[in-house]
Amino acid sequence: MSFNGKSRSFLLRELIRRDFIKKYKRTTFGILWSALSPLFLLLIMDLVFGTFFGRNMSHYTIYLFSGLLLYNYFASSTKGALSVLYSNASIYTKVPVPKIYFILSHSTAQFINFLVSLAVYFVFVAVDGISFKLNFFALIYPTLCLYLINLGISIFLSTVYIFFRDINYLWPLLCRVIMYASAIFYDVSILPNIMRRLLKCNPLYMCIDYFRQVVIHNSVPTLSYNLMLCAMTVFCLLVGGCTYRICRDKIPLYV
């Protein structure tokens, strides 16, 4: 059985639809959870950290929401991808379906959830007194970069999981480290210069900071900033793609 262009496109759409529906199957609120989950977390963290970090910072709620929203998308997308290849083995070991489609569909379904949450984010931006500006269209760039970063990391993790199951426990711990290294609830100005430079080695922080610069400070990051984020995105895709390419023929033997 072979797949032409139309068949592959149809298959990918159906897989995305399956992954998107599966997440909210048999829930009362359905897709609304994409909006409710970050709101509940925002409320709790704003109450806890707003007192300590938000007193001398304007639009702290949006500052916090920017970090939470992008981190939650990153964490849910990459954690959920860990077992994607393993859990779909019963399909691609019997039907010649491109294995990478399962990771791509998972990442895209998570991206759709993120876009729903992003709509809620802009409602909060308006409520906080920040008016819409043309600069906001610049957010398309970090949004797409984060999607591709998540995709690259997801391909890497899902492939490694087949051969090294301990990654299922290690990655959530690393995500916790990444959370603290992404300046979600604290102002980076309290950090020494060397720590600020180290933060810029974290692509997630770069995306979060991009959102904050555009929305809160009404400025678009420099060309060098954009190129650095682009380089990190390409690096993540290359690592994921190369790992998958090296291991893909061995995957059916280990599932």
Task: Tell me what each language-model feature is.
Residues 1-255:
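Hydrophobic transmembrane alpha-helices and immediately adjacent juxtamembrane helices
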